[in-house]
Amino acid sequence: MELVLGPLEARVIGCLIEKEICTPDQYPLSLNALVNACNQKSNREPVLELSELDIRAVVDELIRKRLVVNTAGFNARVPRYQHRFCNTEFGELKFTAQELGIICELLLRGPQTPGELRSRTNRLCSFDDVTQVDAVLAKLAEQGPYVVKLPREPGKRESRYAHLFSGEVDLQALAEAAPASSYASPAADRLTALEEEVESLKAQLQLLAERLAQLEG
């Protein structure tokens, strides 16, 4: 697979995919909305604090790679960004909803077990059980390959999977940065839902402000 994304490029692409699925009425994203999505404290590993300048530089590089496009008109005051990572008319990468849900989570949170992926993708797609997640992961590992099964960590019941859109996985660096927690608690799930609702409201306000500016202009 020729495509290689840097860590911040993976974060931006993951955020654009996530918002396209979860909040389609606010997609494509403005730069401000994209910054908020990249810095979101829920469903992100690691949590980052990126500036508009940081994100603009990443977006410019992704536009150069033809993985992101500005859908706003040439004279528009506010650019709006849409990914062209997959499922485009002439693109090579075509994924089902389940495949895309898994890839999106891996881009946003790094290596995860099938159980974690089933729990965390419920806002992106649906799986009947972990066996179905295993089957989709096996398919993604055969094609491309797009994901890889990592060696099982000591004391863990399940192996984690990582995406390969950023090249081969550095196992030593991964082991040193391995997260201590596994499944999210119900309280964490509620917090995630609230944070996503806040981000959605922020995006709606931003969209209203842009439309008001256009009417006044």
Curated annotation (Swiss-Prot):
Pfam families in the record, alphabetically?
Answer: DUF480
Concerning its family, UniProt says: Belongs to the UPF0502 family.
Q: What is this protein called?
A: UPF0502 protein AHA_2872
Query: What species is given as this protein's source?
Result: Aeromonas hydrophila subsp. hydrophila (strain ATCC 7966 / DSM 30187 / BCRC 13018 / CCUG 14551 / JCM 1027 / KCTC 2358 / NCIMB 9240 / NCTC 8049)
Please name the taxonomic classification of the source: Bacteria, Pseudomonadati, Pseudomonadota, Gammaproteobacteria, Aeromonadales
